Amino acid sequence: MAAKMFYDRDVSLSPIENKLIAIIGYGSQAHAHAQNLRDTGLNVVVGLREGSASRAKAEQAGLRVASIEDATREADVVMLLIPDENQPKVYEESVAPHLTEGKALAFGHGFNVHFGRIKPPAGVDVFLVAPKGPGHMLRRVYADGAGMPGIFAVAQDASGQARDIALAYARGIGCTRAGVLETTFKEETETDLFGEQSVLCGGVTSLIQAGFETLVEAGYQPEIAYFETLHEVKLIVDLIYEKGFEGMRHSISNTAEFGDYVTGPRMVTEQTKAEMKNVLSDIQTGKFAERFIQDAESGFPFMNEQRGKMRDHQLETVGKELRDMMPFISKKELEV
């Protein structure tokens, strides 16, 4: 059975038209949510901690800014869009005391609710809306009159209207222009983490790095290795993004396509897939979440060590030099 997509024609804004929506945070996703909701004609306040460097940015965008406590106290819908590791503390100290019965608590990712790090009270609605793309792109496509696909889920329906509120919110940020799918907090959290770790971030970067190192160790110029293993990834991914595997293979040379079929299975073997299942198991059991939380609470020693190693890697130093020679690469669009 095909999943049902919800579009503008299926969704009414009425469940949130006369409500105040508090966006907690003003980072990559939060700035896009706040501005899109505002431009849809909805009432928005941005909640920021005292002294936040983001206050000026939000005010320059024409948004009203308040403390997290005041924003939560005033709002009917509270969307928590700060980093996962910071959410529980901010929630307990600044949100929970003002999250009275009848309000709605929302998330862009189900991590903290699914793993029990945030436990909302019984009298509030709890939902998530997750656009499937970065914040700067969510804002850009909205401003262009289009939308970004997304997903939504309801974890707690205290009012009997949580699903309608979630869908209305998705419409408010422009996602129903492209279509949204219904999911659960469990499914969103586990599949999102798995995709990031095994394919999108961990898988892709490890594959690129191994390919680059293989060529350089064999005596090839690092600059050539960079082009062949990293730079051209975007060209192929864009084709897959627009046309799928078949369309991509139709667009490349016969030599490249033949090599795809012959060598792909040597790179991603049954052993690789078995390890992917282990990765998924670590996510499902909460093992990954526990490791992430421990590192975060210790000041990220492991993650900072890995960042330092990669910062000094030849792939990064050569890449920076080459990218500086490419005026067609826009640095501004990647800023948050």
Curated annotation (Swiss-Prot):
Mg(2+) 1 binds at residues 192, 196. One of its GO terms (biological process) is L-valine biosynthetic process. Binds 2 magnesium ions per subunit. GO terms for molecular function: ketol-acid reductoisomerase activity; magnesium ion binding; NADP binding. The active site is at residue 109. Keywords: Amino-acid biosynthesis, Branched-chain amino acid biosynthesis, Magnesium, Metal-binding, NADP, Oxidoreductase. The keyword Amino-acid biosynthesis applies. Pathway: Amino-acid biosynthesis; L-isoleucine biosynthesis; L-isoleucine from 2-oxobutanoate: step 2/4; Amino-acid biosynthesis; L-valine biosynthesis; L-valine from pyruvate: step 2/4. It is an enzyme of class 1 (oxidoreductase). Its cofactor is Mg(2+). Mg(2+) 2 binds at residues 192, 228, 232. One of its GO terms (cellular component) is cytosol. The keyword Thylakoid does not apply. Its EC number is 1.1.1.86. Residues 3-183 form the KARI N-terminal Rossmann domain. It catalyses: (2R)-2,3-dihydroxy-3-methylbutanoate + NADP(+) = (2S)-2-acetolactate + NADPH + H(+); (2R,3R)-2,3-dihydroxy-3-methylpentanoate + NADP(+) = (S)-2-ethyl-2-hydroxy-3-oxobutanoate + NADPH + H(+). NADP(+) binds at residues 26-29, 49, 52, 54, 84-87, 135. Residues 184-329 form the KARI C-terminal knotted domain. Substrate binds at residue 253. Belongs to the ketol-acid reductoisomerase family. HAMAP family: IlvC (MF_00435). Involved in the biosynthesis of branched-chain amino acids (BCAA). Catalyzes an alkyl-migration followed by a ketol-acid reduction of (S)-2-acetolactate (S2AL) to yield (R)-2,3-dihydroxy-isovalerate. In the isomerase reaction, S2AL is rearranged via a Mg-dependent methyl migration to produce 3-hydroxy-3-methyl-2-ketobutyrate (HMKB). In the reductase reaction, this 2-ketoacid undergoes a metal-dependent reduction by NADPH to yield (R)-2,3-dihydroxy-isovalerate. This is Ketol-acid reductoisomerase (NADP(+)). It comes from Deinococcus deserti (strain DSM 17065 / CIP 109153 / LMG 22923 / VCD115). The lineage of its organism: Bacteria, Thermotogati, Deinococcota, Deinococci, Deinococcales. The gene is ilvC.
